[in-house]
From Swiss-Prot:
Keywords: Cytolysis, Fatty acid biosynthesis, Fatty acid metabolism, Hemolysis, Lipid biosynthesis, Lipid metabolism, Phosphopantetheine, Phosphoprotein, Secreted, Toxin, Virulence. Gene3D superfamilies: ACP-like. The modification O-(pantetheine 4'-phosphoryl)serine is found at S37. The lineage of its organism: Bacteria, Pseudomonadati, Spirochaetota, Spirochaetia, Brachyspirales. The gene is acpP. It is found in: Secreted. Pathway: Lipid metabolism; fatty acid biosynthesis. 4'-phosphopantetheine is transferred from CoA to a specific serine of apo-ACP by AcpS. This modification is essential for activity because fatty acids are bound in thioester linkage to the sulfhydryl of the prosthetic group. This is Acyl carrier protein. One of its GO terms (molecular function) is acyl carrier activity.
Amino acid sequence: MALIDEIKDVVANQLNISDKSKITDTASFVDDLNADSLDLVELIMELEKRYEIKIPQEDQEKIKNVADAAKYIEEHKK
């Protein structure tokens, strides 16, 4: 499974989205998928756990959609 698709699955699970077609590469977690601040924290924590990375606070604020998350993970994955 491609990284983008894996991240979309994580987003769907964390945000309880049953219609995965809503989760596009550029759909904003907050504006388009209705995530709140707690959702974002939990999403980042799940990505950190799944991909064995640490995402500093200043970088977390830059991850606004699936494409941002995939780019960050590809650049920082061990």
